[in-house]
Structures are given as C-alpha cells and as structure tokens.
Amino acid sequence: MTTTTTKFRDVEIRAPRGTELMAKSWLTEAPLRMLMNNLDPDVAENPKELVVYGGIGRAARNWECFDKIVDTLKNLETDETLLVQSGKPVGVFKTHKDAPRVLIANSNLVPHWANWEHFNELDAKALAMYGQMTAGSWIYIGSQGIVQGTYETFVEAGRQHYNGDLKGRWVLTAGLGGMGGAQPLAATLAGACSLNIECQQASIDFRLRTRYVDEQATDLDDALARIDRYTKEGKAISIALHGNAAEILPELVRRGVRPDMVTDQTSAHDPLNGYLPVGWTWDEYRERAKKEPEAVVKAAKQSMAKHVQAMLDFQKMGVPTFDYGNNIRQMAKEEGVANAFDFPGFVPAYIRPLFCRGIGPFRWAALSGDPEDIYKTDAKVKELIPDDEHLHHWLDMARERISFQGLPARICWVGLGLRAKLGLAFNEMVRSGELSAPIVIGRDHLDSGSVASPNRETEAMQDGSDAVSDWPLLNALLNTAGGATWVSLHHGGGVGMGFSQHSGVVIVCDGTDEAAARIARVLTNDPATGVMRHADAGYEIAINCAKEQGLHLPMITQ
C-alpha cells in the first residue's frame, strides 16, 4: 500500500533527450520518457500537482506513485509487463517480448457508482486518479494534440455554412486550457478571427508565450473593436479576453453581437475543478471546492446553464453553434435548460464521415528530442501521401505556426491503411539511421473505434448505439493482442464521470524487424476497429471502406 499521498512537489520534470537509455530497452525507455514528457512544464497545465490537462487529468496518482513507476520502468525486463491502476503501479508480471510493456486502467468505476461524487471520495482517499484521455496514458503532446482536429472542425463548418471561406469571419469560444488552448490557433489556420474567453490569466499567458493566441484585449469593448477591425481587413487574428464566459456570452447576446460561429472548450465536464462560477475568483473557487464541494458544483452548473442559454440564443439568431465535447449541454440540462441539446455536438455535425473511414488523430513524438527528426517525418508523410493537398497544407502550417511543447511531436489525421504505411516507414528511418532515435506513435482516445461517449464521439449514432461501450473494450483487447507497447483503458475522459469509456494505444518504432511486425498489426487493427464500429452501425461510408480495405466483418463483408 502507498503510505503517503503527496500531490504537490516543487520540482521540474523533463524527459531525457538523446540515445542514452535509463531503462533496459527502448520499449521501456519510451513510456518512461513520455510519462516524464507529460509533466514537462512546457506541456502540463499544473505539473507540480501532476495535472497534465483537463481539470484534474493526472499522469500519476501522487508523487510516490510517480517515483515508483519511474523506478519500475527503469528495471523492467523485455518480457515483463507493468500494470498501472489509476496512476499507481500495482504489479509486474512475466509475459512475452511481443506483449505490451505497460497496461493501464484509469478512473474506471462500476456503472452504478460512476459519478463525480463517488469518484471524488475515492480520489480524496488516494484510491483513484482521473486520467482524462492522454494524461494518464502518457501520450499528451500539448495543445498540438487537438489543433488539427479543431482545425478540421472549423474548416468543415466553413464548408457547410460559408462556402468554404472563413476570411472576414470570427469564432466565439471560451477555454484556453490544455484542450481549449488549441482553438485560437486552429481558427487562425482555418482563416478566421477568434475571440477566446478565459478566466485564468496564467492560461492566457501560456497561450501567448507558445504562440497559440496572438494578442490579449483589455476588456470586452476592446475585444470587439479588434474583431471588427481584423474581420474588415480580412486578417485571421486570435484574441484572448480575461473573464467569465457565463457573464460575457449573455452580455454579447444582450448587445446583439453576431459571431459567425460559437462553441466552447471550458472544462465544464468537471464542475468541481474546471468551471468558475459567476462572480467568484479562481482562488475562492479552489478554496471553497475543498470545504463545500456540493455548493461549488451547484454554483458552477448554474453558471453553465447561463452559458448554454446564451449559446442557444446565438443559435436562434442563425449562428452555427456546436458543443465541442466538454459535456456543458448535459450540465445545463441538469440545471433546468430543457433544450440544451438543441445545438449539436461537433462529431455528428462535422467529423463522423472521417471516423467512418478510420481517420483520426494519429500522432508521433521524437524520443531523441531533436526537432529535425520530426521535420524528416513530415517530409516522409508528404512523400508517401503525395496527392493529399489538404494534408500537405496542414503539415506546412504546423511547421510554421506550431511550437513544440516538450519532446518534438506531430499530429496528422490519417486513417486505415495509411497509419500502418507511415509507421512502417518511420521504423525504417530509425533502422537506417535517418532518424537519430526511435519514434513513438500514438493517438488521442478521441478516435473512430476507441471511445463510447453519447454526448460526444458517439452522439446521435444512426442505429441508436450511442451508449454501447463494448467497442473501446474490444479496441483495447485487440491492441493488446497485437503487441502495442502500451495500452490504456479509461473512463470519464472529456465529458466527465459516467459519460464515457475509451482506450488508448502507443507503439514504438525502434528500427527492428520485431517492431515492424507489431506496427503492421497494431496500426492496421486500431483504425480498422473504427471502421468496424461504424459499419456495424450501418454507415454506408464505413461499409464501403471495410469492403475496399478487405476487412473480415462476418455480418457485413462475408
């Protein structure tokens, strides 16, 4: 048992660079470096408390657990597997060389008890940890990890509502944390201005420093004046505004201000830790959360109700309005906003056709720490996918505009067939010495076959299977069987306790033949489960993709 439970430590963690190993092989060095990278001060939101992003999404349960995970990974043999239970290393077992080196289960609760109240009780007793999606699965790469998905969403919204041209238009949103911090840059890359409301000045400062947001307004009038000037000039400039969205959005409605798109990425999924009630300071919010959690949750949800009502008002004006996956509609509905779900989530509105083809947030990181390794892989992607101008444009913009946070990394939305092709090519680049050290390949849990989340990724499935969570379980089992380097199974990411189950996968390209065999299996099977899941739900795009790719789906393709 863990006898102490230290959640704060005044220390700076950074992943090692170069080719010298702390562990016994690259297959255990990789999770070690990526765990540390999750807590890099340039990556994590609150690394001294082990918080990576998303409210209280942690990399380890407490600092004692972190130390023991590090020590265990350093000494793990090539035929052993470490088991991690909600951020705590609980066992090392003999497996085999093609088995995962780490298996992770975070935040999972029996459904009847799967709520924030019970989870917070367990968390207070150091019996559980909220892993979010990539925080507790050690593959967070900073805000870049969601930039392309947000960019693709804005671009598709532009296609649907504005004939594919966002020049001279602007997005209204809130939240500049680990996920929401991607919004201003994504809007700029898509050609739009954006007004980004954030209640913590430190988060604004972080996004300004990393060039995810361009400038900060002094007040609402100044922000609107800047928006007016830049949209008239056709410039895509992102503006941060310090304040509370639950106050500012209703005021914009009152003034009759009309954005061109409205969404939100505050941490509304976690009312106790992630959404500031109207009229409160952040310090007051954190202090009262410890002393009167029920009252704090109530106050936060009441503010969310005001926020969502304003979003509904914008929708009534004819402004394209959508939820970006933080469960704010659910929170508002619980506070009496009966029609909170009148505006759609971003997946059914804009992203699902990509999921039907297994296309999702494929990402990789250079364990060397050398940016040149990423630039070389960028070039390889262009070489292997020569005709995708949209993808090439994304890679060019990413290199120009996205600052690396921690270990250099890249995200690139590709699907079934191409993921394995790229992974095998990266492995050959390591083998030949073109890359200076191995590459890790992973993805967000927000992917086509790895999540059940009725208020987000699986919202409004055409067969009504929104809440069926067999699919992420099958995904995790298959990736384990295929030989991924580490596999994770989480609950509550993105939308909070009781509303999602999801799985993650990471695989190492170390240049060996054995790695190539594992890569071919895992990077084919993983996106194929997404095609399978959507084909099973009856989506023609997915059924056709399954047939084209030769998937063996007994009830569909045989």
From Swiss-Prot:
A Pfam family this chain is assigned to: Urocanase
Its EC number(s): 4.2.1.49
Cofactor(s) recorded in Swiss-Prot or TrEMBL: NAD(+)
UniProt cross-references to InterPro entries, sorted A to Z: Urocanase, Urocanase-like, Urocanase_C, Urocanase_central_sf, Urocanase_CS, Urocanase_N, Urocanase_Rossmann-like, Urocanase_sf
GO cellular component terms attached to this protein's record: cytoplasm
Primary location recorded for the protein, binned into one broad class: cytoplasm
Top-rank taxon, per record: Bacteria
GO molecular function, one term: urocanate hydratase activity
Active site (UniProt): C412
Catalysed reaction, written as an equation: 4-imidazolone-5-propanoate = trans-urocanate + H2O
Subcellular location: Cytoplasm
Keywords: Cytoplasm, Histidine metabolism, Lyase, NAD
A single BP term in Gene Ontology: L-histidine catabolic process to glutamate and formamide
Enzyme class: lyase
Record's cofactor remark: Binds 1 NAD(+) per subunit.
Stretch forming the signal peptide: none
Pathway listed: Amino-acid degradation; L-histidine degradation into L-glutamate; N-formimidoyl-L-glutamate from L-histidine: step 2/3
Protein residues bound to NAD(+): 54-55, 132, 178-180, 198, 244-245, 265-269, 275-276, 324, 494
Entry function: Catalyzes the conversion of urocanate to 4-imidazolone-5-propionate.
HAMAP family xref list: HutU
Family: Belongs to the urocanase family.
Protein name: Urocanate hydratase
